[in-house]
């Protein structure tokens, strides 16, 4: 597939997502559909409810893909969609009181869970910054930077295990329960996210955290 073919295929895929998965009422995108694009809340095999119609993970990876396309497709349509998507994440998915993402949400963005996912939060800090940079709008960049650095600080203070360099998985602020499991991807996202926070703020603690996460991942997750 040549570059032009790939670009056209990407545009067609975006058109399908906008037609079948985009929510024109509350903005954002539904979590899942059947093969015929029929709306189908994702509950099979997981402890979720049909009201969990939107997830931050879905929006994280959609904005990652849309941002990648915007680098090549500078059309007003893509610029507007990426801007809208970024502000949905900043205004609807980030909980600015505690500087973490809401995990699962109803169609109207009401939170349906209280868990915090440190891996997704630190991942989002560099992904949203990347989106704002590609978007190239000063106000969006300022708002995104402030939000993301607050999130990075919260991840560092609450999710980064300073004694060995591990990034914790999930935490329930209501029950105080932390997941005992660690995953490779959370460590890798922490490497990138803390490195980005150091580049933005110049605070050495983030560089130290990035390096410690790297060493922890290399020691425990690389065979």
Residue map of PLM features:
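Glycan-recognition and catalytic cores of secretory/periplasmic carbohydrate-active enzymes
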Residues: 1-223
């Amino acid at each position: 597939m040549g570059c032009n073919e790939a670009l056209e295929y990407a545009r067609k895929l975006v058109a399908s997502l906008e037609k079948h998965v985009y929510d024109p009422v509350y903005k954002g995108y539904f979590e899942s559909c059947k093969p015929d694009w029929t709306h189908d809340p994702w509950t099979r095999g997981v402890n979720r409810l049909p009201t969990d119609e939107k997830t931050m993970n879905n929006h994280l990876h959609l904005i990652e893909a849309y941002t990648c396309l915007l680098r090549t497709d500078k059309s007003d349509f893509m610029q507007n969609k990426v801007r809208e998507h970024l502000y949905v994440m900043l205004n609807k998915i980030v909980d600015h009181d505690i500087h973490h993402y809401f995990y699962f949400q109803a169609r109207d963005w009401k939170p349906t869970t209280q868990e915090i996912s440190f891996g997704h939060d630190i991942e989002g800090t560099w992904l949203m910054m990347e989106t704002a940079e590609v978007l190239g709008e000063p106000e969006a960049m300022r708002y995104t930077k402030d939000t993301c650095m607050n999130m990075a600080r919260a991840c560092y203070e609450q999710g980064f295990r300073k004694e060995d360099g591990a990034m914790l998985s999930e935490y329930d602020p209501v029950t105080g329960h932390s997941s005992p499991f660690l995953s490779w991807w959370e460590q890798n996202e922490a490497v990138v996210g803390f490195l980005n926070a150091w580049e933005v703020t110049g605070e050495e603690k983030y560089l130290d955290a990035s390096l410690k996460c790297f060493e922890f991942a290399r020691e425990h997750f690389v065979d």
